């Protein structure tokens, strides 16, 4: 009887070990039969979150202009875009005051702006622009504090200003709202930095336009969270040279898209790659 009890006890232990050990042997993310592979990292915050839908309500602000009629002085800027003509933004751009710029997270957002409540200087119609620069506060001034907090202000390119107001107005009251960005072609990824500090400028982003979260994946790595450096330049110190790269991008409205195999294994610095799809 004791022998039978021992045999039953041993079989019971073996069953427990099989239940406990076998799943562990597959490791994190392994596939069992037709099971779906677990993700490399936790989902990005706000992914496809309908509560973060674009706020398209109209708000009050002011607008001025900077640069010349050809866009002089509007190129480069605090969003990191560089040559706005080459990158597809052209003259339909504006620098935002501190209250709107949001430490660069608003770079790439699109707005519709119209001149209001000043019939002497306002022109009918509206303009649609992309945020590409920052209008810094000037705390030494006591008047004309257009870009100082908490003022909401758009410093438009001259070409855009002249579509909604007369030149001599200088500054006009406006109404503005966020609108979806309509861009041609795929999202663009421009490489900068060095092997130990990869920086990627992401531009030509449709939909909400402004990016809140970025991950990169080499063909030998999982998803790696990138840090916002300045404007829409995103960085990682993980060495990824020699690997093909994919990107996961989340815009401010919570929508996320995966851009697979954007860069081949032999990518280099100072190159621009087309993500082929857009928001």
UniProtKB/Swiss-Prot annotation:
SUPFAM superfamilies: Barwin-like endoglucanases, PHL pollen allergen. InterPro entries: Expan_Lol_pI (IPR007118), Expansin (IPR002963), Expansin/allergen_DPBB_dom (IPR007112), Expansin_CBD (IPR007117), Expansin_CBD_sf (IPR036749), RlpA-like_DPBB (IPR009009), RlpA-like_sf (IPR036908). Disulfide bonds: none annotated. GO terms for biological process: anatomical structure morphogenesis; plant-type cell wall loosening. It is a peripheral membrane protein. GO terms for cellular component: extracellular region; membrane. It comes from the Eukaryota. Residues 1-27 form the signal peptide. Keywords: Cell wall, Cell wall biogenesis/degradation, Membrane, Secreted, Signal. Residues 196-275 form the Expansin-like CBD domain. PANTHER family: EXPANSIN-A15. Causes loosening and extension of plant cell walls by disrupting non-covalent bonding between cellulose microfibrils and matrix glucans. No enzymatic activity has been found. This is Expansin-A22. It comes from Arabidopsis thaliana. The gene is EXPA22.
């Amino acid at each position: 009887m004791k022998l039978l009890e021992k045999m039953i006890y041993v079989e019971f232990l073996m069953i427990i070990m099989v239940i406990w050990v076998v799943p562990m042997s597959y490791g994190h993310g392994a596939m069992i039969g037709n099971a779906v592979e677990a993700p490399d990292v936790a989902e990005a915050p706000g992914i496809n979150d309908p509560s973060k839908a674009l706020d398209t309500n109209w708000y009050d602000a002011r607008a001025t202009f900077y640069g010349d009629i050809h866009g002089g002085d509007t190129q480069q800027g605090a969003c990191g875009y560089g040559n706005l003509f080459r990158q597809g933004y052209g003259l339909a751009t504006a620098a935002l005051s501190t209250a709107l710029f949001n430490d660069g997270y608003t770079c790439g957002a699109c707005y519709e702006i119209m001149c209001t409540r000043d019939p002497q200087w306002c022109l009918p119609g509206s303009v649609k622009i992309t945020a590409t620069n920052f209008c810094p506060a000037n705390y030494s001034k006591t008047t004309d504090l257009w870009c100082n907090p908490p003022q909401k202000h758009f410093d438009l390119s001259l070409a855009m200003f002249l579509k909604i107001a007369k030149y001599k107005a200088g500054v006009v009251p406006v109404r503005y709202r966020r609108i979806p960005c309509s861009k041609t072609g795929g999202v663009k990824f421009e490489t900068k930095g060095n092997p130990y500090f990869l920086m990627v400028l992401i531009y030509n982003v449709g939909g909400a336009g402004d990016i809140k979260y970025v991950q990169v994946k080499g063909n030998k790595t999982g998803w790696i969270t990138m840090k916002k450096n300045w404007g829409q330049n995103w960085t990682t110190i993980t060495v990824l040279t020699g690997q093909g790269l994919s990107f996961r991008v989340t815009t401010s409205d919570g929508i996320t898209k995966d851009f697979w195999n954007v860069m081949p294994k032999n990518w280099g610095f100072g190159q621009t790659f087309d993500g082929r799809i857009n928001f």
